[in-house]
Design a protein with these regions (language model features):
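Conserved MFS/SLC helix-loop-helix module at the cytosolic interface between two early adjacent transmembrane helices
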Residues: 68-107
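Hydrophobic core of transmembrane alpha-helices in multi-pass small-molecule transporters
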Residues: 27, 96, 107-123
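Extracytoplasmic
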Residues: 17-52, 69-73, 159
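A generic transmembrane-helix signature of 12-TM secondary carrier transporters
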Residues: 90, 94-97, 112-113, 179, ...
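Cytosolic juxtamembrane N-terminal segment immediately preceding the first transmembrane helix
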Residues: 1-25
Length: 205
C-alpha cells in the first residue's frame, strides 16, 4: 500500500520533500535550456553574424558537451554533495545565458553553448536522480517518476514565458533575465530543501 508517512512517528518522510524540491528544481533547467533551444536559435539566426546552420550547430555542441560533462558529473556526485554540482551548473548556465546577448562570432557562440551544455548537465537530471536514489529504497521508481515530471512542467510554463520575454524585451535583454530566473529558481531550492542523504539528518531511507 502506498503511503508517504513514517509509521513510527506518523510524519511525512523527508524523502518526499526531496522529491517535491527536485520536481520544482528540474522545471528551470528543462524549461530554460532544453525546451528553449528553438527560441534561442531563432533569435540568433536573425542576427547578421550568424546563420541558421551555425545556430543549429551550437545546439549540437550543447548536447555534446552536456553528454561529456554528464559522465564526470555522474562520478562526482556519487562521492560528493550533489548540491555543489547543481549550484555550479546553475552558475555556468547563468553566465552562458548572459553571454548569449554579447556573442559576435561563431566561435564565441560555440564556446558559450559548450558552457551552457555543461551547466545544464551539472544542474539537472544527473544530480537530481542521484539524490532521489539515495533517499529511496522502496518506492524508488515512483519517486523518480514524480520528480522527473518537473522536466515537462518546465516546457509548459517557462518556455511560453521565455517567448513573451524575448518578444517584448528583445533577445539581448531577455537572455540575461532568463539566466537570472535559472539561477534564482535552482540555487535556493537546492540549499533550503535538499539534503545530501537520509543519514545526514538521522533518518533511514
Amino acid at each position: 500500500k502506498f503511503t508517504m508517512w513514517r509509521e513510527q512517528d506518523n510524519q511525512v518522510y523527508y524523502g518526499w520533500k526531496i522529491v517535491a524540491a527536485i520536481f520544482v528544481l528540474l522545471t528551470f533547467p528543462s524549461g530554460l535550456s532544453f525546451y528553449n533551444h528553438a527560441i534561442y536559435l531563432n533569435a540568433l539566426a536573425a542576427q547578421p553574424a550568424f546563420t541558421v546552420g551555425s545556430a543549429s550547430m551550437s545546439v549540437s555542441i550543447f548536447f555534446l558537451t552536456g553528454g561529456v560533462t554528464g559522465l564526470f558529473v555522474a562520478r562526482w556526485v556519487e562521492d560528493y554533495d550533489p548540491r555543489i554540482s547543481i549550484t555550479a551548473g546553475a552558475i555556468m548556465s547563468f553566465f552562458a545565458l548572459c553571454a548569449l546577448a554579447y556573442v559576435k562570432t561563431t566561435l564565441q557562440l560555440f564556446l558559450v553553448y559548450g558552457l551552457f551544455g555543461a551547466g545544464f548537465a551539472a544542474s539537472s537530471l544527473i544530480p537530481a536522480t542521484t539524490l532521489v536514489t539515495r533517499w529511496f529504497r522502496k518506492k524508488r521508481a515512483m519517486a523518480l517518476s514524480i520528480a522527473s515530471t518537473g522536466l515537462s512542467l518546465g516546457g509548459v510554463i517557462l518556455t511560453p514565458l521565455s517567448i513573451l520575454m524575448v518578444d517584448s524585451l528583445g533577445f539581448n535583454i531577455a537572455a540575461p533575465l532568463i539566466g537570472v530566473i535559472y539561477l534564482v529558481g535552482v540555487i535556493p531550492v537546492s540549499w533550503i530543501f535538499l539534503r545530501v542523504s537520509p543519514e545526514s539528518i538521522g533518518v533511514l531511507p
